[in-house]
C-alpha cells in the first residue's frame, strides 16, 4: 500500500473508456517480465526504502518511488505524445543524525522516453531519477536540490509474492486486490552525496485497477528487517469509525527465505506515542512467531506535505527494539482526511 496524493488528484481528469484488467487470484507471475510495467492495469508502483550509514555511523533513511497511472482511451491517435500513462515519482531522504527530512516530487507523462518502466530497457525512470536493473540487482539514482544518491541494491533472497493465491486482497469483492511482489532484503552500497554508505533496503512492486472499499479511509504499513534475518510486512486498513478492517494482513519471511502469510488475527499493532496526529511509536506482536517489538521513528517529523491537494501523510525510517532488533519503514495515511483511489 502506497499513497501518492497528486496522482490521486489528477487521475479523474484522465478517466477514459479503456477496460483495465482486475487483479484476480491465480495470476501467472513471470519474472523478470513482471518486475516492469503492466499497462493493462490502471495503477502501479515501484517502491524503494532503506536504512544506511557511513563509516562514521551517520545514519540515513532513503526513499525512491515510481508511480504509473493509466489514462488510456480507445483512440486511433498514434502520436508518441498522446497521454497513455502519467508517471509520478518521489524521492525522500532522512538525515537521522542531523535531524533533517527532505522530500521531492515530479510528474511526467510517458511521452517518448521521458518516463517509463521498460522490460526491454530493464529500467524504471522519471527524468534522471531511475532504477536500472541487471538481473535482480537494482541501481538507484536520484538528484535533487538538497541531496543526491547513487545506490546499488543486491537481493539476498528471491522476490516473494504477497497475499494468497497470487493476490493481496484489500476488501470484499471481485478485483478489490493487487498483485504484490517484494524484495524484502537487499544489501545496499553506494553514496549519498559524497558519503559512502552501506545498509539494507526493501523493494515493493504492486499493480491493480481497484483496491479500497468506501468505508476504508487509511492504513498503517510496516516493513520490518530484523537482525536475525526475519522480515515482516504488516498493514492495517482503518474504517471511518476507527475499526480495523478484517482484510488487514501481512507476511513473515523466515531466516530461510520462506514466506508465511499472516491473517488479521495473527498479529497485533498497538500505537504507543504520537507526534501531532501520527502514531510514531508502536508495539508489534506476532505471537505465533514469538515476536514482541517496538517500532520508533528515527525522526518524528517525516511527514510528506502536499499543500495543493491537502493530502498529507507520514512515511519514514524506524528502528525496532524488544525481543528482536532491526530497522525498517512505516507509512501512515488517512489521519488528516480519507484516502481515495479512483476507479
What are the residue ranges of the model-derived segments?
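Structured soluble/peripheral alpha/beta segments that form catalytic or ligand/cofactor-binding pockets
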Residues: 16-343
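Bacterial N-terminal signal peptides
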Residues: 2-13
Amino acid at each position: 500500500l502506497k499513497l501518492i496524493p497528486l496522482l490521486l488528484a489528477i487521475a479523474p481528469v484522465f478517466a477514459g473508456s479503456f477496460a483495465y484488467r482486475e487483479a484476480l487470484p491465480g495470476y501467472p507471475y513471470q519474472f523478470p517480465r513482471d518486475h516492469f510495467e503492466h499497462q493493462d492495469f490502471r495503477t502501479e508502483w515501484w517502491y524503494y526504502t532503506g536504512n544506511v550509514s557511513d563509516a562514521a555511523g551517520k545514519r540515513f533513511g532513503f526513499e525512491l518511488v515510481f508511480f504509473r497511472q493509466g489514462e488510456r482511451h480507445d483512440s486511433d491517435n498514434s502520436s508518441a505524445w498522446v497521454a497513455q500513462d502519467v508517471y509520478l515519482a518521489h524521492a525522500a531522504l532522512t538525515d537521522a543524525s542531523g535531524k533533517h527530512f527532505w522530500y521531492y516530487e515530479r510528474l511526467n507523462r510517458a511521452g517518448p522516453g521521458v518516463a517509463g518502466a521498460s522490460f526491454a530497457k530493464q529500467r524504471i525512470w522519471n527524468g534522471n531519477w531511475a532504477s536500472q536493473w541487471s538481473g535482480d540487482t537494482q541501481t538507484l539514482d536520484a538528484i535533487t536540490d538538497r541531496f543526491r544518491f547513487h545506490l546499488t541494491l543486491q537481493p539476498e533472497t528471491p522476490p516473494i509474492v504477497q497475499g494468497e493465491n497470487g493476490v493481496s486482497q484489500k476488501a470484499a469483492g471481485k478485483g478489490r486486490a493487487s498483485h504484490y511482489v517484494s524484495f524484502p532484503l537487499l544489501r545496499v552500497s553506494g553514496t549519498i552525496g559524497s558519503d559512502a554508505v552501506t545498509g539494507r533496503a526493501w523493494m515493493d512492486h504492486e499493480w491493480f485497477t481497484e483496491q479500497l472499499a468506501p468505508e476504508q479511509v487509511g492504513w498503517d504499513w510496516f516493513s520490518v528487517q530484523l537482525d536475525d534475518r526475519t522480515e515482516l510486512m504488516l498493514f492495517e486498513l482503518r474504517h471511518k469509525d476507527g475499526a480495523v478492517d478484517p482484510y488487514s494482513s501481512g507476511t513473515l519471511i523466515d531466516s530461510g527465505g520462506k514466506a508465511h502469510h499472516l491473517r488479521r488475527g495473527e498479529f497485533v499493532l498497538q500505537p504507543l506515542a504520537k507526534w501531532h496526529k501520527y502514531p510514531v511509536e508502536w508495539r508489534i506482536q506476532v505471537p505465533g512467531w514469538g515476536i514482541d517489538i517496538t517500532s520508533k521513528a528515527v525522526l518524528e517529523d517525516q511527514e510528506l506535505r502536499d499543500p495543493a491537494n491537502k493530502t498529507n501523510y507520514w512515511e519514514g525510517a524506524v528502528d525496532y527494539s524488544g525481543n528482536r532488533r532491526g530497522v525498517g519503514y512505516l507509512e501512515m495515511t488517512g489521519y488528516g482526511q480519507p484516502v481515495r483511489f479512483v476507479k
